[in-house]
Structure formats: structure tokens, C-alpha cells
Amino acid sequence: MLPPGRNRTAQPARLGLQRQLAQVDAPAGSATPLGPAQVVTAGLLTLLIVWTLLGNVLVCAAIVRSRHLRAKMTNIFIVSLAVSDLFVALLVMPWKAVAEVAGYWPFGTFCDIWVAFDIMCSTASILNLCIISVDRYWAISRPFRYERKMTQRVALVMVGLAWTLSILISFIPVQLNWHRDKAGSQGQEGLLSNGTPWEEGWELEGRTENCDSSLNRTYAISSSLISFYIPVAIMIVTYTRIYRIAQVQIRRISSLERAAEHAQSCRSRGAYEPDPSLRASIKKETKVFKTLSMIMGVFVCCWLPFFILNCMVPFCSSGDAEGPKTGFPCVSETTFDIFVWFGWANSSLNPIIYAFNADFRKVFAQLLGCSHFCFRTPVQTVNISNELISYNQDTVFHKEIATAYVHMIPNAVSSGDREVGEEEEEGPFDHMSQISPTTPDGDLAAESVWELDCEEEVSLGKISPLTPNCFDKTA
């Protein structure tokens, strides 16, 4: 998004104007050669723009091509995210890249429209990320209600609200000049952003060669709240809750696996070998934690520095030579530019984070014409869905075990349409761990107890009914 006035200094504008005048005075047919730093900058920014375009186009094409992907409501939000990131790569990045390499804004009065596109596309991308987190939390915490309520119409309404809000806080304030700092705007006649008067002949050139506007404090704070701070707070809450629910489900699956293996070892009367299912469940919890941490970490690292400066810079002092500076110190132009591009770079990473699962990889391979060569190495990823949370390769196995074990116990009905509460997350596992105690190697007493436990005949009629959470609260 747009840096609000940077240092409120005329120096970058004067340097850019001098470069323009030098180019006008240069002989016809000659052009100022780019320096090494400009060439490197142009190359890196071009790669970033091309990668962002290709990644998001591939995501949209995969969903349009695959009926299976179109059937999932979540992918409506993925398409909306990809479209907003495509707009960032088409309507925002190229113009700024040219200005970075040239050293000034060469597109004249297109500046105001570009500013509106910048705010709209960046806000839409962030709001779509927030909607995806809410959608996943709703799907996992209340899966049956989610299946009933999350229709295509509801999904489109949510997407429409995100885009409407993005347009409202971008085009309307920018076109009506509500976003500018009245005291320090470059649009003020004869004045620079720091109040320094322009020479009469340089006024028009100075306004058009530098596209950075001075945001007023009200707009900078309110737009930052809507575009970033409120969405990031929602994302932190939802992904924290998703992780806690994932913990519950993974441990529940691990307990069912141990119980099923215990029953099988009793029937075969073979030597029992403790299964490392507990270690596997810990690994899966770690995998879920890493996945969610990556989602939040990339988003926060890309956008947080910019939005901190976005709220801080309007309070910067103009720093006149005759008086001392007051307020926050202003940041350099280079620092602000780096953080702006960091935020836009998030649009190039979103396709990797949100669309690089097994279903998308298969369609990607078909679109790229390399079904036999692309993505042949199996990659274990975590499914964050309304089904059991597990590795892709183990999902069917876990469901079979869960179904078989539930059928073994009468009245064992789990609450599928109720949110997992905090009271469920700690207590139940102590009871479940008693179903399949592990035997330490070399402990004769423990092995004897285990053999007696296997030899004892269990009557299903004697099993007392369980609570709705599959756990008996009585001794």
C-alpha cells in the first residue's frame, strides 16, 4: 500500500525534477543509462511480478478446470484471494516498479487512480485471508452446521462484502481527497508536503513527478484498522482455536489406534510390541502447529512493518531548520519502499501457502503438461478441513479405525455439531489413555498384567454407556 508522505521532504521531488530537466536538455536519441543498482532492482522486481502473476493465474485456472475443486466452497475464497493478488500484480506493482527504477513518477495524473487501486487490492487480499481463516474455523468447529449453511450463495455474499469494503475505503476517500493531510498535502497550491513554497514554474512538475501522498492521521489509522489490525486479530483467534481443535482430534485418533491394536494383539495372542502412535501424534500436532505458524508468520512478517509505519508517519515532525523536531522520527524513503514491497510480496506467497495441497498439485501438473514428472515426490501435508485432521496418506486409515472402534462400543456417539470446549481438551485423554496402556520393555510385572488384561473376557453388555464425547466420567 501507499507510504503516507514518507519524510514530508522536497528533496526526492527536486532530485527527480532535475533528472527530468536533464533528460529534456539531452541530445535527441540519447538516453540516460541505468546504473548497476537500477538494473538489479529492475530484475528483482520483474521476477516478483512475473511470479505473482503466474502463481495466481495457475490457481484460478486449476479451480476453473477441475470440477472437484469447484465443488468445494472454500475454493471460492481461494479464487477471490487469487484475483485480488492478480490485481496487485497487474494494477499496482508494475507502475511502482517503473517509478522505482526511473527515480520519479512518470505517469502524471494517473497517480490518484493508482493510489486507489493500491489500497483496494491490498485490502481485498488481506480481507480474503481473514475470510479463509473464519471459513476453516467454522468448518472444523461446527462441521455439520457448516455443511448445511455454507452454500455458494453465502460464500459469494462473504466475498462480495470483502470487496465492497475494500472499494469503500479506497476509491471514495481518494477521489474526494479525504485521505490527504490538509496541512501537508502536495496538492496545496504553491506548497510542498513540509510547507516549503515551490518556485512558480516548478509547481505542476513537482505535483506529478512524485506520487506519494500525505495521509491525514484519521484516515491512516482508520484504514489501517480495517485493512490490517482487525483482520489480523481475527486470524490469530481463529487459527489458535483451529490448532487446539486439531490437538484434540489428533490425540483422539491416536487413542483409537492404540485401542484397536490392543484388541488385535489380544485376539492374535502374540507378543505385544508397543506402537509409537503417541510419538506419531506428537509429530502430527507439531506439523499442524508449523503449518498454522507459517500461514500467520508469513502474513504478519510481510504486512506488519508497513502498517506500523503507516500509522506512525502521519505523526512525524516536519523538522523545519529553524525549530526542533517534535513527535515521531520519520523513516527514510528507502526503508519505506522496502516495507511496501514486502507487503506486496505476500501476494506472491499466497498461492504457495493456500493452494499447494495434493488436489491442487494434481491439477497443476495437468495444466503444465507434466503429469508424470511434476510433483512425483510424495509430500506430507496437513489437511485443515472439517474432516479428521491428519496427514493425507493416513486419512482413510484413521477413518476406518475410528469407525471400527466406535462400532465396538455401544452408545459411543461423538458430538459432531458442537464446538470443542476447553473442558474436553484436557480431561478426556486421561480416560482414553487407560484403554491401551503401553508396556515397558523388560518389565515382567507389567507384561503379566498385560497378559491378564488380554485374557480377561470382555462383555459388551457390561460396558456402561459413555458420555456424548465418548468418555465415561464414572469410575
UniProtKB/Swiss-Prot annotation:
Brain, in the lateral mammillary nuclei, the anterior pretectal nuclei, and several layers of the hippocampus. The chain crosses the membrane at residues 39-64, 76-102, 112-134, 154-179, 216-240, 290-317, 336-357. Dopamine receptor whose activity is mediated by G proteins which activate adenylyl cyclase. Glycans are attached at residue 7. Belongs to the G-protein coupled receptor 1 family. One of its GO terms (cellular component) is glutamatergic synapse. This is D(1B) dopamine receptor. It comes from the Eukaryota. Keywords: Cell membrane, Disulfide bond, G-protein coupled receptor, Glycoprotein, Lipoprotein, Membrane, Palmitate, Receptor, Transducer, Transmembrane, Transmembrane helix. The gene is Drd5. It is a multi-pass membrane protein. It is found in: Cell membrane. GO terms for molecular function: dopamine binding; dopamine neurotransmitter receptor activity; dopamine neurotransmitter receptor activity, coupled via Gs; G protein-coupled receptor activity; G-protein alpha-subunit binding. A lipid is attached at residue 370 (S-palmitoyl cysteine). Pfam families: 7tm_1. Disulfide bonds join 111-211. Residues 65-75, 135-153, 241-289, 358-475 are cytoplasmic. GO terms for biological process: adenylate cyclase-activating adrenergic receptor signaling pathway; adenylate cyclase-activating dopamine receptor signaling pathway; adenylate cyclase-activating G protein-coupled receptor signaling pathway; associative learning; cellular response to catecholamine stimulus; G protein-coupled dopamine receptor signaling pathway; long-term synaptic depression; mating behavior. InterPro entries: Dopamine_D5_rcpt (IPR000497), Dopamine_rcpt (IPR000929), GPCR_Rhodpsn (IPR000276), GPCR_Rhodpsn_7TM (IPR017452). PANTHER family: ADRENERGIC RECEPTOR-RELATED G-PROTEIN COUPLED RECEPTOR, D(1B) DOPAMINE RECEPTOR.
